[in-house]
Amino acid sequence: ELIDFDTNQTRAYAQGLVDLGDPNWGGRLSGTVEEENAAQSIKTNFSNSGLPSTLEEFDVPLYYMGNTFEMMICIPGNVGGIFGGPAPCSVADLDRDEVQFEHRSDFVVQGYSGSVNIPASSDVQVIDLDMGNETQDWSAASNGIGLVWLLDGENGQQGTESNTILMKRAQENSLRGLIVVNSRQNCDDLVSGDCVPYSKSLDITEFEERPYDIGFVMVSKSVGESIRDQVVNSEGMLEFRIEVDNQNNGNVHVPCGILEGETEQLVVIGAHHDTVYNGQGAVDNTAGTATVMEMARQFGLLQEELGEPVLTI
């Protein structure tokens, strides 16, 4: 028998958490006041649903978003190409052509990215590393930017590896930037004919030194194709500026509501309330956390009606 589920209440829970997000990009990044406020709100709702609740704190490696997130392709103008004239794609290159990409929709920061400041005029090389496996020449992208495509493997072969592995290769080969192109997931769901980017983390404990100076983002399929066609295979220059501090530890907050059962056997139901961004679907829409909150409310109502459960929830 299924429990009841109030979709309107669930949407209200989700909106309440969204309203607590960062004023710039809507996220509730771990260790920030937005994340702590969200955790406290969830604990309060658990208590209001009749569940004894706690709020735990854990000291973990964290990263903090700054204020600069820029990506742009510049096509040099005629002025910038004159011998002895201004540098191509510099401010003095008056007839240059620029294509700006939008943070949150065209590209999103990946977990534990570092900071990087690459103006287009520096003409830093961008190297297409295909799926980024160990057979690719990562050293060719040293002091440059690697472009890796998120793909499934063919004929039973392994697909693109994890963010952790990719970032370790970037660090080992002294890359300044790493761009993963989403060409595998969330395709045609939110944007017709495109695969929208999403934010994923990595296992920072795998790194002896946190990669503070490597910018790490995921871009949509269309943006990745533009970088490949206009920069890797043509004369375009990429501007890449990412500001993230990944060098500190801080506290994350875990709200927990408990329904004691007749036995010590556990049913664990959870979702993450922290998020770098907040948006539709692929970025993070807070639906998981809101669903858990509504389930907790329904379990509280059932406990009032039926008494304690057999298992501890």
Per-segment meaning from a language model:
Residues 7, 12-15, 19-145, 153-154:
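Noncatalytic luminal/extracellular "stalk/propeptide" segments of secretory-pathway proteins
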Residues 3, 167-172, 256-260:
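Short amphipathic alpha-helices and their capping/turn segments at secondary-structure boundaries
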Residues 108-138, 204-282, 294-297, 301-308:
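Soluble metallo-hydrolase cores and metallopeptidase-like ectodomains found primarily
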Residues 7-35, 41-53, 145-161, 182-185, ...:
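Catalytic-core environment of secreted peptidases
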Residues 39, 66-70, 159-168, 254:
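Short alpha-helical segments and helix-capping/turn motifs at coil-helix boundaries
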Residues 128-185, 189:
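A conserved hydrophobic secondary-structure block that centers on an alpha-helix together
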